[in-house]
Design a protein with these regions (language model features):
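Active-site/ligand-binding neighborhood in enzyme catalytic cores
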Residues: 84, 91-232, 243
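Short, solvent-exposed loop/turn segments at secondary-structure junctions
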Residues: 12-13, 36-38, 102, 158, ...
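Mid-domain catalytic core of redox enzymes
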Residues: 24, 218-338
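Conserved flavin/dinucleotide-binding core of flavoenzymes
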Residues: 46, 286-391
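N-terminal FAD cofactor-binding segment of flavoenzymes
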Residues: 59-91
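Beta1/beta-strand and adjacent pyrophosphate-binding region of the FAD-binding site
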Residues: 1-13, 30
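Short alpha-helical segment within the catalytic ATP-binding CA
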Residues: 16
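Glycine-rich FAD pyrophosphate-binding loop
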Residues: 19-48
Length: 391
């Protein structure tokens, strides 16, 4: 095999590893991905009817306060000044999210100062001691009070998890942000924006190196016997699948997308609209044209929308969010022990660590793996730490 390193998975984690090893160390890197495209879940493509760029696997919004990550990603793309804002429909009314002073004033039907709103929410939240919360519902009430919880958390959570919040682990919502001002930016990071030319153009530049060989629609497991033991591997696929689900499958939630072209220039006036009512089957609607208002070539008489439906992932589904039950955590410990014994294989990324990672987190984690493990091995002759999960 004419490769110094094999990377399994062409998402942000895998491509960051491949790019660093090829550009900085001059290594020959073979990247394998079972899909027909690179970029993992950040992959985007133009809708065939409207030409509007669609985030195929759901909305991807780049944001970070990590200077190292920002310096790295801006080598490959310029970013628009897009700032993400989310709204939620409840009982036919629209509220800004996350909960802020505008949300509170609109919901309770009166103007309040920051101190008045803070005191009211604290009084309502005092119904339950957060330290004693036995489930997600009790935790939610202890954080924002019953009225706001019932309005904006309960129904949405029920749809997102298909489980009564009274039966969910309180750790799922360790905090619920409430802003006592009128700031409705969704993220608070120093840097935020969307790649000017789209995500696929961005990741294509990362992979554009003569030493990087990307092979799509290629299953690592069909070639693992030829790879393992012959060349180091960075594996970003599901950690349970790597070990043949020997400790059992880890549980995930998946998302079904329903794409539709509407014969209007603007369907909802914003990129993401949540639906908090329990009787609405989808959790939110994405209208991708609003991600790039600077693009004047989008049609003014058509738009594309994507409805999101959340459910438990079954065999063959795309895993999105780790459910992370106590049973899952026990299985993960077994897989981590197995990973430590796997020679010359490093596990990383969302699937490889069973952690939900935003894009900047995946990139940052990959940069750390490169600096702390791969670079010392290939450039300094240090032994590659056998196995282990990059955390």
């Amino acid at each position: 095999m004419n490769a110094d390193l094999v990377v399994v998975g062409a998402g942000f984690f895998g491509l960051t590893i491949a790019e660093r090893c090829a550009n900085e160390l001059g290594l020959r890197v073979l990247v394998l991905d079972r899909r027909h495209h690179i970029g993992g879940n950040a992959y985007s493509e133009p809708d065939p009817e409207t030409g509007i760029e669609v985030h195929v696997y759901g909305a991807h919004l780049f944001h970070t306060s990590n200077e190292k990550v920002w310096d790295y990603v801006t080598r490959f793309t310029k970013f628009t000044p897009y700032q993400h804002r989310v709204f939620s429909i409840l009982d036919g009314k629209v509220f800004p999210m996350p909960v802020n002073l505008a949300t509170i004033c609109e919901f309770f039907g009166r103007a309040m100062s920051p101190d008045e709103a803070r005191a009211m929410v604290a009084e309502q939240a005092g119904e339950i001691d957060g330290a004693d919360a036995a489930n997600l519902e009790e935790k939610g009430i202890s954080l924002i009070g019953r009225p706001l919880y019932e309005a904006f958390v309960r129904g949405y959570t029920l749809k997102q998890w298909q489980t009564d919040p009274k039966e969910l682990d309180p750790a799922i919502i360790s905090r619920l942000p409430v802003r006592y001002n009128f700031d409705n930016r969704y993220f608070n990071d120093k840097y935020e924006g969307l790649p000017v030319d789209g995500y696929t153009a961005w990741v294509s530049k990362m992979a554009d190196h003569p030493n990087i060989d990307v092979r799509l629609e290629t299953d690592f497991f069909d070639q693992r016997d030829d790879i393992l033991g012959n060349v180091p591997v960075v594996y970003t696929g599901p950690i349970d699948a790597y070990f043949g689900n020997s400790a059992g499958e880890l549980s995930w939630r998946t998302i079904d997308f329903e794409r539709e072209v509407k014969n209007v220039g603007d369907f909802q006036g914003t990129s993401v609209m949540n639906y908090a009512d329990e009787d609405v089957p989808y959790t939110r609607i994405i209208e991708p044209r609003h991600f790039h208002p600077e693009r004047d070539h989008y049609p003014n008489d058509k738009t594309v929308i994507m409805r999101e439906f959340s459910r438990f992932a079954e065999s063959g589904d795309e895993p999105y969010y780790p459910i992370n039950t106590a049973e899952d955590r026990a299985k993960l410990l077994e897989y981590r022990d197995l990973a430590k014994k796997e020679p010359d294989v490093l596990f990383g990324g969302r699937l490889g660590t069973y952690k939900y990672l935003d894009m900047h987190m995946a990139i940052g984690s990959a940069l750390t793996m490169f600096e702390n493990k791969l670079k010392p091995h290939f450039a300094g002759g240090e032994a590659l730490v056998s196995g282990g999960v990059d955390e």
